[in-house]
Amino acid sequence: MKTFRSADDALYRGPKHKIYNTFVWLNKDKAVAEMQTMMFAYHDLDGSTYSRNGWARLLYKVQKTEGIWKIKGLDCIYERDLMIPVTPDYGFDTEIDFDKFRKSYKCISYLFDRGGVPNNNELPGDDKLQLVEALYAEADEWLNTSL
């Protein structure tokens, strides 16, 4: 039983990131890599446990220096997130105004707001395509600029 409990405790430690398909654009000693990512974590709110799941794309800039690939930059493009009760008898406070948060990361914004953490509404996300397009343009320019 103690082993099971230890494994159960480990399940609730911090957020997890699962990285899926990776796309790479290579130009000599530089590359841009985009990775589809799912992030999930458990949160206890008002006596109920919720699973927060988020989907994003991680955009890495990497460069080969002296034969070693090194990360030069990392950006995250948020797609969407959700929170679901771990058991079906839990529910959300219907007074929560989720509309005040951006669609691509409204649940994590709610958790930050609730915890008094400042929320950045200008992160790249699928609900603000101009920010995403600017990020890709900057990565493309970096990739195609010689040293």
Give a label for each model feature.
Residues M1-M39:
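A solvent-exposed, acidic/Ser-Thr-rich amphipathic alpha-helical stretch
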Residues V32-E34, W55-P88:
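Short beta-strand edge/turn micro-motifs at domain boundaries
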Residues Y42-S48:
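Flexible, membrane-facing loop/turn or short amphipathic-helix motifs
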Residues S48, V62-T65, L135:
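Intrinsically disordered, low-complexity regions enriched in Ser/Pro/Gly/Gln/His and often acidic
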Residues G91-L147:
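A hydrophobic membrane-anchoring alpha-helix module
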